[in-house]
Every structure is written in C-alpha cells, then in structure tokens.
C-alpha cells in the first residue's frame, strides 16, 4: 500500500547531517603506487602498446572482465590498434564491437556491473564522449553515494585523445 509507505517516510527521522558525506567515494585497496616506473632492465614501449598490455593484464587477472565499444573487436582492434590481438586471445564473447552509441556504451556498464562483469569500454574518440556524459555524471560517478556504498560501479572507460585526426564536429 503506497499510503502506508508514504506515512512511514513522513514519520522517519531526519537524516544525520554528520553522515551526509558518507559514501561519496568508493573504498579502494590502492592507497599508494607500487613498482618501478622505469625499470632499468626494460625497454621503453609506445603508449598505445602500454594501453594494450594493461588491458590484457586486467583481462588475464579477471575472467569476468569484458572489453567493448566502437571498433575494438576482432576485425579492426581499435582505431589506433589499441585493442589488437585481444579478441584473438580472449574471444569474441569478451572483446566485441557495439553500435556507435556513446550513451549506451557508457551507461551499459551499470547493468554489466550488476550482472557481475567488470566492463572496460572504449569510446572511439574524445570528440564523441559528450552523449555519454549524462550516464557518467548522473549514474556512474554517484553510484556509491546513491546506494549507500552497496553498489559502486566499477568500470574503466577508455577515450583516445590527442592523436592524429578527430572524429566529430565539436
């Protein structure tokens, strides 16, 4: 009965002002940097390769992780080849293309997290990010606060910027 629940809400005590900032930030086990930034015995690599290797590492360590977005699937492997070989290694069920629909790409991470996945998504160019900002700002960034810490969205959103070319009329 809606009326009963409404009366319960009206009768509820006022929120405690000292707790208003609880759950603004999701807890993290990472509190400091570890490892060496430039190990002496390693060769330097291109930034695009570093991104590829980082995603590969995440996908190897977390079988529930997925990579999807614009042109990251097997055929192209990313506009800058930043996802090359990932579909071959992890399969088309974990690395796949989506429609060119930035709001969907970013917003779908909420549902993917609810289903137990660890989504990694890519918007093809920073020029295209604007339609997805509403999902990022109103849903993902506030998920820990709005759920009282019960459902912080864990996603990684990759957006290439600063390379040659561009994508949109922005």
Mark where each language-model region is.
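Active-site or pore-adjacent capping/gating segments
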Residues: 1-19
């Amino acid at each position: 009965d809606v009326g009963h629940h409404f009366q319960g809400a009206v009768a509820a005590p006022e929120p405690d002002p000292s707790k208003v900032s609880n759950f603004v930030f999701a807890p993290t086990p990472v509190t400091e940097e570890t490892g060496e930034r430039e190990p002496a015995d390693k060769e330097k690599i291109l930034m695009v390769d570093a991104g590829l290797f980082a995603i590969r590492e995440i996908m190897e360590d977390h079988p529930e992780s997925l990579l999807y977005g614009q042109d990251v699937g097997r055929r192209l492997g990313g506009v800058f080849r930043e996802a090359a070989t990932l579909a071959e290694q992890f399969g088309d069920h974990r690395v796949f293309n989506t429609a060119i629909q930035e709001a969907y790409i970013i917003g779908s991470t909420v549902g993917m997290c609810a289903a137990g996945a660890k989504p990694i998504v890519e918007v093809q160019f920073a020029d295209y990010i604007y339609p997805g900002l509403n999902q990022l700002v109103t849903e993902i960034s506030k998920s820990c606060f709005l759920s009282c810490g019960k459902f912080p969205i864990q996603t990684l959103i990759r957006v290439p910027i600063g390379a040659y070319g561009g994508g949109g009329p922005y």
